[in-house]
């Protein structure tokens, strides 16, 4: 009993400390991805590959989901300056890549 209670506590703590990206059905065709925890740590621009905004009314928080070069998704607060700077950098990077012949 003590072992299962300790394991449950450990799992709850681990879940609270990790960045969670959960998918909930918005409609039959397209799912909505929501962020429930936002990172407080700045992510190096070199580690970022892309991003998408989370603005669905079905989600509790407005967020930006960055995808890293290692294909990891990280939720961030779009009001933070580093997040805005990173999105601008990725936008500029994608424009220069699509402009090349």
Swiss-Prot record:
The keyword Disulfide bond applies. The keyword Secreted applies. Induction: By TNF-alpha. Pfam families: IL8 (PF00048). It is found in: Secreted. Keywords: Chemotaxis, Cytokine, Disulfide bond, Inflammatory response, Pyrrolidone carboxylic acid, Secreted, Signal. It comes from the Eukaryota. Residues 1-23 form the signal peptide. Its main location: secreted. The modification Pyrrolidone carboxylic acid is found at residue 24. GO terms for molecular function: CCR chemokine receptor binding; chemokine activity. This is C-C motif chemokine 2. It comes from Canis lupus familiaris.
């Amino acid at each position: 009993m003590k072992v299962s209670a300790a394991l449950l506590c450990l799992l709850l703590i681990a879940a609270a400390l990790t960045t969670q990206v959960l998918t909930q059905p918005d409609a039959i065709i397209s799912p909505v991805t929501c962020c429930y925890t936002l990172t407080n740590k700045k992510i190096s621009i070199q580690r970022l590959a892309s991003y998408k905004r989370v603005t669905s009314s079905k989600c509790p928080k407005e967020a930006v989901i960055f995808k890293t070069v290692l294909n990891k998704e990280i939720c961030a607060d779009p009001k933070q300056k580093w997040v805005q700077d990173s999105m601008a950098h990725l936008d500029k990077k994608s424009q220069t890549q699509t402009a090349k012949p």
